[in-house]
């Protein structure tokens, strides 16, 4: 059974994390150096999060339909994304096993992976603060 019952829950958890990162004074400039727009297309439940990371521009996070044109598209189950933010999924391994699929210059995404490790505890705190301890037991 999926961790999230609908797209609204995906946006309230994973989406909120992206919004927080886009406005974080320390991390946002580092992510913007990727100079790309990434769209995360999730299944179970169907949802989309598009993140604009362009150096010198404001970050932008859109849920669902967007006017942004992604350069990179990452497709996976929402559960896989959730487990990634808990620190339980290795991106390279997930790509090799087909748990994640990527279109576009994947190297841009892989360069960001080292930046996200400090975000894992933030995601856990965010879930706790939202009263979603049930999501902390993902495996």
PLM region spans:
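Feature captures hydrophobic
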Residues: 1-139
């Amino acid at each position: 059974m999926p961790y999230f019952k609908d797209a609204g829950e995906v946006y309230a958890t994973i989406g909120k994390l992206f919004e927080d990162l886009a406005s974080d004074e320390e991390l946002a400039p580092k992510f913007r150096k990727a100079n790309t727009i990434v769209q995360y297309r999730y299944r179970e439940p169907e949802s989309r999060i598009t993140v604009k990371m362009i150096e010198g521009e404001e970050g932008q996070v859109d849920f669902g339909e967007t006017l942004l044109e992604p350069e990179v598209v990452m497709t996976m189950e929402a559960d896989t994304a959730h487990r990634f933010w808990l620190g339980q999924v290795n991106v390279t391994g997930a790509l090799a096993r087909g748990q994640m699929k990527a279109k576009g210059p994947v190297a841009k995404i892989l360069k960001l992976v080292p930046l996200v490790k400090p975000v894992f505890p933030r995601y856990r705190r965010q879930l706790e603060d939202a009263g979603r301890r049930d999501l902390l037991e993902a495996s």
